[in-house]
Curated annotation (Swiss-Prot):
PANTHER family: DUAL SPECIFICITY MITOGEN-ACTIVATED PROTEIN KINASE KINASE DSOR1-LIKE PROTEIN (PTHR47448), MITOGEN-ACTIVATED PROTEIN KINASE KINASE 1 (PTHR47448:SF2). Residues 270-307 are annotated as: RAF1-binding. Residues 68-361 form the Protein kinase domain. It catalyses: L-seryl-[protein] + ATP = O-phospho-L-seryl-[protein] + ADP + H(+); L-threonyl-[protein] + ATP = O-phospho-L-threonyl-[protein] + ADP + H(+); L-tyrosyl-[protein] + ATP = O-phospho-L-tyrosyl-[protein] + ADP + H(+). This is Dual specificity mitogen-activated protein kinase kinase 1. The modification Phosphoserine is found at S218, S222, S298. Disulfide bonds: none annotated. The lineage of its organism: Eukaryota, Metazoa, Chordata, Craniata, Vertebrata. Keywords: ATP-binding, Cytoplasm, Cytoskeleton, Kinase, Membrane, Nucleotide-binding, Nucleus, Phosphoprotein, Serine/threonine-protein kinase, Transferase, Tyrosine-protein kinase. It comes from Mus musculus (Mouse). The keyword ATP-binding applies. Dual specificity protein kinase which acts as an essential component of the MAP kinase signal transduction pathway. Binding of extracellular ligands such as growth factors, cytokines and hormones to their cell-surface receptors activates RAS and this initiates RAF1 activation. RAF1 then further activates the dual-specificity protein kinases MAP2K1/MEK1 and MAP2K2/MEK2. The proline-rich region localized between residues 270 and 307 is important for binding to RAF1 and activation of MAP2K1/MEK1.
Length: 393
């Protein structure tokens, strides 16, 4: 279907000239923002949603600790705790991430300054940013609240995520990574199911990407638990690029498709338990080296073997064959897509442009999938009355 010429983005200046969290909301800023948004290939619905978010954001003004009321805890990890909060002056519901750091004021100020880049990150595939500030020993990052939570939470309820749904997830992740790279020259650095957020409108967005080098350095010691999604080249301490994010996406897709973290691979017996039938393929083979393998504590599978020690797991990622999807359960296109993401040599691994034209992505893009309906029935959410773009089954 040919794309309609997008109508210009309409952004109205805040009536009282209030600041967008400390930055001027002068009309020149709005014009620059309007121009950037028009460069993005958005459909009508995406354009309207982004427009609505940015118009709401103008009403927020400077963020202060006293202006928030805690509603509930959404999750913890990556060195911080995330709360669902109400921003009393605007009445908006937000997600507020609190990161406790024992750091000097100069470092703290640099982190807040670097986080301001997030104001420029406006894409349907990136979680919206309201602002960042420091208060009582904690850095607060205030974001759009995604009512479906993260895909690791969805996976716990679903058991496994269907291939058609993962097709839509793959498109959103590739488009989000492409946007970060092309428009902001940054890579994500931490792609995993808990950093892919979803909502009842059927939107899929990336969060927690490495925009602040100083924050990455300050939190270096808290990243041990997430190393299981890191690429072999990154674990070996060699140069890494956005190709590393592609490995992490591939690993995440295998985990969500199979229903458990895929290293070490499930054996034939476990695959039979997971899928309720005999499953062929490499994933069912015994790990190549004699060892006492097991799964990391974070997986959701039926593997009764003792969990792998973290050093053993990292050694496995670097030295053993990469995970694969079991054949006979998933389409050949999906299997090939994952294989191209999980090539150990980053120079041979598919890049974002190649993945965007892969047969699996082309097929997934053409498929009508009610992502919002599937999500809401899986996790018990009420679906909003406005149908999602892909929900016209």
């Amino acid at each position: 279907m040919p794309k309609k010429k997008p109508t210009p983005i309409q952004l109205n200046p805040a009536p009282d000239g209030s600041a967008v969290n400390g930055t001027s909301s002068a009309e020149t800023n709005l014009e620059a923002l309007q121009k950037k948004l028009e460069e993005l290939e958005l459909d009508e619905q995406q354009r309207k949603r982004l427009e609505a978010f940015l118009t709401q954001k103008q009403k927020v003004g400077e963020l202060k600790d006293d202006d928030f009321e805690k509603i509930s805890e959404l999750g913890a990890g990556n060195g911080g705790v995330v709360f669902k909060v109400s921003h009393k002056p605007s009445g908006l519901v937000m997600a507020r991430k609190l990161i406790h750091l024992e750091i000097k004021p100069a470092i703290r100020n640099q982190i807040i300054r670097e986080l301001q880049v997030l104001h420029e990150c406006n894409s349907p595939y990136i979680v919206g940013f309201y602002g960042a500030f420091y208060s009582d020993g904690e850095i607060s990052i205030c974001m759009e609240h995604m009512d479906g939570g993260s895909l690791d939470q969805v996976l716990k309820k679903a058991g496994r995520i269907p291939e058609q749904i993962l097709g839509k997830v793959s498109i959103a992740v590739i488009k989000g990574l492409t946007y970060l790279r092309e428009k902001h020259k940054i890579m994500h650095r931490d792609v995993k199911p808990s950093n892919i957020l979803v909502n009842s409108r059927g939107e899929i967005k990336l969060c927690d990407f490495g925009v602040s080098g100083q924050l990455i350095d300050s939190m270096a010691n808290s990243f041990v638990g997430t190393r299981s999604y890191m690429s072999p080249e990154r674990l070996q301490g060699t140069h890494y690029s956005v190709q590393s994010d592609i490995w992490s996406m591939g690993l995440s897709l295998v985990e969500m498709a199979v229903g458990r973290y895929p290293i070490p691979p499930p054996d034939a017996k476990e695959l039979e338990l997971l899928f309720g039938c005999h499953v062929e393929g490499d994933a069912a083979e015994t790990p190549p080296r004699p060892r006492t393998p097991g799964r990391p504590l974070s997986s959701y599978g039926m593997d009764s073997r003792p969990p792998m020690a973290i050093f053993e797991l990292l050694d496995y990622i670097v030295n053993e064959p990469p995970p694969k999807l079991p054949s006979g359960v998933f389409s050949l296109e999906f299997q090939d897509f994952v294989n191209k993401c999980l090539i150990k040599n980053p120079a041979e691994r598919a890049d974002l442009k190649q993945l965007m034209v892969h047969a699996f992505i082309k097929r997934s893009d053409a498929e009508e999938v009610d992502f919002a309906g599937w999500l809401c029935s899986t996790i018990g959410l009420n679906q909003p009355s406005t149908p999602t773009h892909a929900a016209s089954i």
